[in-house]
Amino acid sequence: MIKHALSVTRDGDFAQWYQTVISEADMAEDSGVRGCMVIRPWGYGIWERIQRLLDDRIKATGHENCYFPLFIPLSYFEKEAEHVDGFAKEMAVVTHHRLIQKDGRLVPDPEAKLEEPLVVRPTSETVIGAAMSRWVQSWRDLPVLINQWANVVRWEMRTRMFLRTAEFLWQEGHTAHATVEEAQEETRKMLEVYRDFAETCLAMPVVAGEKPENERFPGAVSTFSIEAMMQDGKALQAGTSHFLGTTFSSAQDIKFQNSEGQFELAQTTSWGVSTRMIGGLIMVHGDDDGLRVPPMVAPWQIVIVPMLRDQPEDAATIDYCKSLQAELAKLTALGEPVRALLDLKAVKAQTKRWGWVKKGAPIVIEVGGRDVAGGNVSVIQRNKLYREDGKLDSRIMPRGDFVAEAAAILESIQQGLYLDARERLDSNIRRDVTDFDGLAAMFADSVKFPGWAEVSWAKPTGAELDAVVERLKALKLTFRNVPGTAAPAEGTCLFTGKPAVERILVARAY
C-alpha cells in the first residue's frame, strides 16, 4: 500500500487537497489582507516561466510591452456604461491622498479628499483607450499592438488562492485596428496563441471557442475563451480574447482619418491570462503527493540532493554533485538550457527529497557515498514516483547514462503529463445528452465525476437566454463556450426545443 506525502487526497476532499498542495509545495500563503496572497518563490518561479515563454510568443506576433498607471480616474469608467456595470461591485476606490493621527489612530484626512476618485486597476481598457486616442490620428498610425504585464484588483468576496483573489497578476493585450476584419483576426490569433501556450508549455489541453452572450466580457461584441478540465471534472476558464468593436473607441474617442480623408472609429481588442493558470496547473497535474510541474515551466527541472552524513567523504560527494550540476547545465532540453539546482541546505536528505517531490520538481537526483564510488546517481521521476510494489521508484543509473538521457527524460515527462490530461478531457465530454432531464441526471449530486456535456442549442438571446441560464444555475451549471472544433448541430435545442444552430459546452466551473 502506497503511503502518500499529503494527508488529504483528491478523492477524499478535492477542495482541501488543492489548498494542501499550495501549502505543502510552498506555492503561496495568505497575507494580512483578505483575498490577497503572498506568492512564494516556487510559485512565483512558475509565474516567471509562464511570463518568459508567453512573452516571447506575444512579441513574436508583433506586440510590444508597455506599462500604464495602477490608478484610473473614475470618469474614464463612466464613459462606458456596460463596462462599469460589469465591474462596479468589484472596484476598489481611492478617495483620499493623506492620513492624519486622530485619537491615536491613523485616519484619512478630511482635508485631503481627491477631487475625483481613482479606481485601482480592475482592467485597463479605459486608461489604454484614452492613450490610444492621443496616439492615433491617421490610418498610418494603425494597428496599435501593445501588451502589459501588471497586477489588477477586483474585490472578490469568495476567494481561493490562484483562482479568485482580490489582487492577481496577469498580462493584458490591447490593440486598435482600422477594420472589423483585422480586429476579429487579431482576436482569433491571440486565442490560438493561448491555446498553443497552454497545451505546449503547461501540458494543459483546452477547448477553444466563443462564449455565449451572457458570458461576454462587459462591453465586448464577442468573447472567446480556452477552457481546461480539472481532475474533479469542473471547467476552468484559463484565458480570454475579446473583440470590442467600437465600444471603447467610441467612449474614449479613438478615431482616425482613413486613406480617403474620412474619420472612422478604430476597432479594438483585448486579451489576457493570469496567475489563474497556476491554479489550473495544480488541478490538472497534481496528485496525492503534491504538485507535478511540467518541465517547460518548472523553475528547476532537475534537483540534485547530496546524501551527506557528517563524514570526511561528504566533501567528495559535494564535489561530485557540483560537477554533475555543471554537466547538466550544458545540456539543452525542450528548446532551452537545462535548469539544474544543487540543494545544499542544512536539512536532512530525506526531508529535502520529499520537499521537492511535493513541489513537483520533474527529476530529483540523490547522490550518496556509494554513488560517488560507483560513478552512479539515483533518479526519481516525479511522474513515475512509485514501483508496482508501492515503494518509491529510485533508479540507480550510471552517471554518464543519466546525463546522456536527461533531456529525453524531461521531454517524456512533458509529453506524458499532456497525454494523461488529454485523455481525461477527451474521454469525459459527453455528446449524447439530448434533453434537459438527461442533463439534470448527468449532473445529479450523486454523480461524483460528471465531466462536461456538449449539447445542441438554438443560441437564444435576451429574456429567453436569461431563462435558460437560470435553469442551469439550479444545477450549478454554466455555459463554457462554443467549441471551434465542434461538429455541426443537429436536431433541436436542448433548452428551447427550437432548431439547433450550434453545439455548446455545459459544465460546473471555477
UniProtKB/Swiss-Prot annotation:
GO cellular component, one term: aminoacyl-tRNA synthetase multienzyme complex
InterPro entries cross-referenced by the UniProt entry: aa-tRNA-synt_IIb, aa-tRNA-synth_II, aa-tRNA-synth_II/BPL/LPL, Anticodon-bd, Anticodon-bd_dom_sf, Pro-tRNA-ligase_IIa_arc-type, Pro-tRNA_ligase_II_C, Pro-tRNA_synth_II
SUPFAM superfamilies: C-terminal domain of ProRS, Class II aaRS ABD-related, Class II aaRS and biotin synthetases
Reactions accelerated catalytically: tRNA(Pro) + L-proline + ATP = L-prolyl-tRNA(Pro) + AMP + diphosphate
Primary location class: cytoplasm
SMART domains per record: ProRS-C_1
Signal peptide: none
Cell compartments where the protein resides: Cytoplasm
Gene3D superfamilies in UniProt: Anticodon-binding domain, Bira Bifunctional Protein, Domain 2, C-terminal domain of ProRS
PANTHER family named among the record's database cross-references: BIFUNCTIONAL GLUTAMATE_PROLINE--TRNA LIGASE, PROLYL-TRNA SYNTHETASE
Protein name from the UniProt record: Proline--tRNA ligase
Organism: Sphingomonas elodea
Taxonomic placement: Bacteria, Pseudomonadati, Pseudomonadota, Alphaproteobacteria, Sphingomonadales
